[in-house]
């Protein structure tokens, strides 16, 4: 228990430091980016592409399993393999959710009502469709990261996670700045930045587990608990029940947190979405810095004790 508490303290410090650096980088990048692109592009890129099309399918399908990883026994081989099997099982579901989100955004493109501001460029429909395709690729890369991420999460490797997330945010910000400020790219820059944000953790986690930890997390049957037991099992009942409960909770939480974003994305204009994004990013920065890492590590501690 003392080791778990020490890991929790280190985890809170690491995640808060990583979050602080990440938010500082994001804030600086957003200030510079907003001068290069208009409110309409900012609203569509941040709200539709980042929050809904990229993060939406991922949060809906993976958050329950990530929380279940905190409650798993890292020393139990079958429990660890159950986590890996579930992540591979959920991968097609995540892709299906992404396709459904993309279809909804395709048939309901961004609404541009206020066209009197000549300095605020409207979102091009062809660029918007290409950006959706790029975002789909980013979702696929993020899905391939999940098997190794949940293993790191179950083993409380918060230091590793903090470093990887910090470099991922840095890569995303630098990509956004280069594409918008130097190449004058608009909506597609958000999608390409998400590809960078998903690619860095994909390479980092897999390299760590293959090269350093010497294991390759792949789906395979669990080890039999009794001699002579031939029936193949791919997931323990306890892990399946725990993940189902957390999945349901994460679905409710996501709908409560993002209900207004969904309505604004499909009903509001892109200019209104841009104003909302600026206010939302600044208003929630303290909560994300202080309370989110503490909440996450509290769940990990209570699940392990």
Can you say where each PLM-predicted feature lies in the sequence?
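Juxtamembrane interfacial secondary-structure elements that flank transmembrane helices
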Residues: 59-76, 99, 103-113, 144-154, ...
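Interfacial helix-capping/hinge residues at the ends of transmembrane alpha-helices
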Residues: 30-31, 66-67, 146-153, 161, ...
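Substrate-agnostic recognition of the 12-TM MFS/MFS-like secondary transporter fold
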Residues: 87-90, 146-169, 255-257, 277-280, ...
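Helix-loop junctions and terminal segments of transmembrane helices
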Residues: 59-77, 154, 283-305
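Membrane-interface helix-loop junctions in multi-pass transport and translocation proteins
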Residues: 32-46, 121-133, 155-163, 167-218, ...
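Signature of the first transmembrane helix
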Residues: 2-63, 93-115, 134, 138, ...
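N-terminal membrane topogenesis motif
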Residues: 1-28, 43, 66-67, 74, ...
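Transmembrane helix-loop junction
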Residues: 35, 71, 154, 180-181, ...
């Amino acid at each position: 228990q003392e080791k778990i508490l020490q890991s929790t303290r280190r985890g809170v410090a690491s995640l808060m430091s990583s979050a602080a650096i990440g938010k500082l980088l994001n804030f600086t990048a957003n200030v510079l980016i907003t001068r290069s692109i208009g409110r309409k592009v900012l609203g569509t890129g941040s709200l539709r592409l980042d929050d809904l099309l990229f993060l939406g399918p991922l949060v809906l399908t993976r958050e329950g399993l990530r929380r279940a990883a905190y409650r798993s026994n890292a020393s139990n081989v079958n429990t660890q393999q159950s986590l890996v099997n579930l992540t591979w099982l959920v991968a097609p579901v995540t892709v299906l959710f992404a396709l459904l989100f993309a279809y909804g955004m395709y048939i309901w493109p961004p609404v541009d009502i206020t066209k009197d501001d000549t300095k605020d460029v409207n979102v091009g429909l062809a660029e918007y469709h290409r950006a959706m395709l790029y975002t789909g690729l980013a979702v696929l890369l993020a899905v391939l990261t999940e098997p190794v991420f949940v293993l790191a999460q179950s083993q409380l490797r918060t230091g590793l996670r903090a470093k990887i997330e910090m470099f991922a945010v840095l890569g995303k910000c630098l990509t956004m700045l280069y594409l918008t400020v130097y190449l004058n790219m608009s909506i597609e820059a958000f999608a390409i930045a998400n590809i960078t944000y998903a690619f860095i953790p994909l390479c980092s986690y897999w390299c760590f587990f293959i090269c350093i930890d010497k294991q390759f997390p792949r789906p395979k049957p669990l080890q039999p608990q009794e001699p002579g037991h031939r029936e193949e099992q791919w997931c323990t009942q306890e892990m399946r029940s725990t993940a189902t409960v957390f999945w349901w909770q994460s679905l409710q939480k996501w709908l409560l947190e993002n209900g207004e974003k969904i309505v604004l994305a499909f009903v509001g204009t892109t200019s209104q979405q841009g104003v909302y994004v600026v206010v939302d990013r600044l208003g929630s920065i303290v909560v994300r810095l202080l309370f989110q890492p503490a909440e996450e590590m509290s769940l990990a501690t209570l699940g392990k004790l």
